[in-house]
Amino acid sequence: MESPWNELTLAFSRTSMFPFFDIAHYLVSVMALKHQPGAAALAWKNPLSSWFTAMLHCFGGGILSCVLLAEPPLRFLANNTNILLASSIWYIAFFCPCDLISQAYSFLPVQLLAAGMKEVTRTWKIVGGVTHANSYYKNGWIVMIAVGWARGAGGSIITNFEQLVKGCWKPEAEEWLKMSYPAKVTLLGSVIFTFQQTKYLAISKHNLMFLFTVFLVATKITMMITKTALVPFACFEDTLSRMLFGWQQQFSPCEKKSETKSSFNGTGSSTSKPVANASDKVKKKHSKKTE
């Protein structure tokens, strides 16, 4: 007989994301789009462009993972139910009378519930991406990590293409150059689930899914309540960067000291030259007098 813990984690891993968790994911993605400057005005002027941008926010991870695996990028359009659901949320979020959806979403408990449910879908996307990549490239670590990362956090990455098309792309906002917390934690999850998939991490998948989801939800809710950009592994990042890439900074003070010593020796030799020249002149004068 299985333990209650295993029964709980196994039942959790079998939870369907449709429709409630998918609705939360679409709602958070669309509301993040609406809060961007000029997004509401663009929806009134050009609804088709706004709808396309919303679909990129909702399905960007799946599109990017398809591109990496050389699959049709528009395969997400084949799921009519999810497209209609995401389109309905986009419509009521931008065109609801009296802006009722935005007013309801402004309450903190609603935001916490939606954000927590969205983090649950992130775990499912990472696991799905890693498993799907493993079916193409057996035990291909790099491919599995890349596809799991793309499916879990590809929405924020692929929207850079949308900003480039609209002409409002900014290099300093590039996700590859300055990774956000969701991108970092998704990369971490992709690495962990890749190790589990390749049997290098001795833990069952359903237990790992439960523990990682609890970590994601707890961290996200804490960040929203405290309104701080809390990064749980910032100390680990700093220590690892110093160990692997901080050697040049450690040796730079030694180089500066050697440079100062050489410059001091150079000035000393330059000052000794006039003294030597003066002594030579004195010797010449003395020899002339004796003559």
Curated annotation (Swiss-Prot):
Native source species: Bos taurus (Bovine)
Keyword Transmembrane helix attributed: yes
Region (Disordered): 257-291
Main location class: endoplasmic reticulum
Localization terms from the record: Endoplasmic reticulum membrane
Pfam family, one: TRIC
Comp. bias intervals (Basic residues): 282-291
Topology feature Lumenal, residues: 1-15, 70-80, 123-138, 197-207
Name used for this protein in its record: Trimeric intracellular cation channel type B
